[in-house]
């Protein structure tokens, strides 16, 4: 008799437990499945930016950084976003960071953004003239990449992301 009364209660407890675990699992899957877009082909201005940054790092006694397709893809999505909203920003940086942690094994993520510069040299020089941007360029990272896109008026937008794996 006691077992017959306990069985429905145990069934309810089990149902609640399984439902709770399923939600935790779904949440973890959502975080781990942040989509990484297809990596766009590198433009000459992007290659030049990466070369200038690595040349600067070498003159400072730092290691050259490796370019990374996943970093480029994530940077590209942010550059497209800045063009879409017509504003230079670090909006949604935490999402880019989570994506790179999940998809590029990044432990540390930082970024520089820019707008309106007409050449690779001018945007890199502007970043180097800014203490916070220069700190990112000189940081202890392993990989980086950059996205440069023009809006409909021909103005350039830049996103440069650094990671340490």
Regions found by a protein language model. Name each.
Residues 16-20:
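C-terminal motif of bacterial Sec signal peptides marking the signal peptidase cleavage site
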Residues 21-165:
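Functional surface patches built around histidine and acidic residues
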């Amino acid at each position: 008799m006691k077992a017959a009364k306990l069985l429905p209660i145990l069934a309810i407890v089990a149902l609640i437990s399984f439902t709770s675990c399923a939600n935790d699992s779904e949440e973890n899957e959502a975080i781990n499945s942040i989509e990484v877009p297809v990596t766009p082909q590198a433009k000459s201005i992007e290659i030049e930016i990466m070369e200038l940054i690595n040349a600067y790092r070498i003159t400072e006694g730092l290691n050259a950084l490796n370019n990374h397709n996943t970093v480029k893809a994530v940077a590209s999505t942010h550059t497209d976003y800045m063009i879409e909203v017509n504003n230079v920003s670090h909006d949604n940086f935490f999402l880019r960071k989570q994506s790179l942690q999940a998809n590029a094994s990044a432990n540390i993520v930082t970024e520089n953004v820019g707008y309106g510069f007409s050449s690779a040299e001018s945007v890199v020089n502007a970043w180097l003239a800014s203490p916070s941007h220069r700190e990112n360029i000189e940081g202890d990272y392993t990989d980086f990449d950059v996205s440069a896109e023009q809006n409909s008026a021909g103005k350039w937008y830049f996103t440069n992301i650094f990671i340490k794996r």
